Regions:
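Extracytoplasmic gate region of multi-pass secondary transporters
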Residues: 12, 28-79
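C-terminal transmembrane helical hairpin of 12-TM major facilitator-type secondary transporters
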Residues: 95-156
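Small/hydrophobic positions within alpha-helical transmembrane segments
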Residues: 4, 40, 73, 77, ...
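Juxtamembrane helix-start elements in MFS-like secondary transporters
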Residues: 63-71, 135, 139, 172-173
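Intracellular helix-loop hinge segments at the cytoplasmic ends of transmembrane helices
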Residues: 54, 155-164, 177
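Helix-to-loop junctions at the C-terminal end of transmembrane segments
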Residues: 81-93
Length: 185
């Protein structure tokens, strides 16, 4: 590849950026905003992928193989769907796609947030019981909706960066990626 490919001279850096000039980007509120977006979509994606196996085992009594298979099915499509997210962001704009992703995540995560609950209320006529919570199928469907939204959102955040920081795309992408990675762990 190295011998048979060429480089475009316009892609080469013409000025030497200093470390201090790159670190000045940390003072830009937009960079910090993109860090927050990416910590939700990437950090949340990684966090969910790491958490879901144990949750399936402890909450739904799945065996480890079933839970790991669901976690793998959640994690693997993220790359393909990220490419789709790039196309959607190019077509509809990073702003609309990112906010759509955030609203889908908010609604789905709200529904996922309520734990399995068994309530008993003592009444005059005896105890009344209620069970509240999601069974494994709706839980998994909602989790996959969140995963798809987060995969699309990972691309839309970088579309923001390429639109607004074309001359500093490397530094801003590095900062945003660092924050997103830290958020997942």
């Amino acid at each position: 590849f190295w011998f048979f490919s060429y480089h475009d001279k316009s892609h080469l850096v013409v000025n030497n950026a200093t470390l201090s000039s790159q670190l000045q980007l940390l003072k830009d509120p937009n960079v910090l905003r993109y860090c927050q977006y990416y910590s939700v979509v990437f950090g949340g994606y990684v966090g969910l992928a790491l958490w879901m196996t144990k949750y399936y085992v402890t909450t739904y009594d799945f065996d480890l193989k079933q839970a790991a298979l669901l976690a793998a099915c959640f994690s693997l499509p993220g790359g393909v769907l990220r490419a789709l997210g790039g196309w959607i962001s190019d077509k509809y704009g990073a702003y609309h796609v990112t906010w759509g992703v955030m609203w889908v995540c908010l609604g789905s995560l709200f529904l996922l947030s309520y734990p399995q609950t068994h309530m008993v209320i003592e009444t005059v006529n005896g105890p009344m019981t209620w069970d509240i919570g999601l069974s494994p199928i709706p839980f998994t469907v909602l989790l996959f909706i969140v995963g798809i939204a987060m995969a699309v959102g990972k691309a839309s955040v970088f579309k923001f960066i390429s639109d607004e920081y074309s001359s500093n795309i490397g530094a801003v992408s590095g900062i945003v990626g660092l924050v997103g990675g830290l958020a997942g762990f």
